[in-house]
């Protein structure tokens, strides 16, 4: 079983076409491969502050040697913080991406103590003009956010090598030829349009199968 711990972007792994409740309320968990645990709003940059709730969650699970812990964070950083902070701090956004990712991976390394393989889910392509997001702060154009997402995922994949975390993402599969997001992958929920729809699940499952994480 792959235990998916994350912000609202963990909801897709429930197998249900709707947002899931926050843990400890249970998600729908309709798929045989995943269990989804939404811990509420969180950023990759400040994930260390969520250690108490994440540890409580993990300690509540009956983990076996066949299980995985997967972490799903980073979209909020890309959409709401990195471009904004680049301007505020007058620093290249690429520099902030590296700083954010390094902090994220460092915070995840704490959970190696459970001796369960760790999977890191790379942030998805950002919301697009095809399906406008009106639910909260967002900076930059779709293409700008996707370029940052690409840099974030590239850096994240590299940073996962040393701690031996499995990295997996469908970011590239979500892009149109011009680098914008194919909105068909995104949800149709009122005020959202920035989470994955269950329409993306075949692509997700193929990625996990190719990585040998599911059969």
PLM regions and their residue ranges:
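Substrate-gating cap/lid alpha-helix
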Residues: 128-170, 194
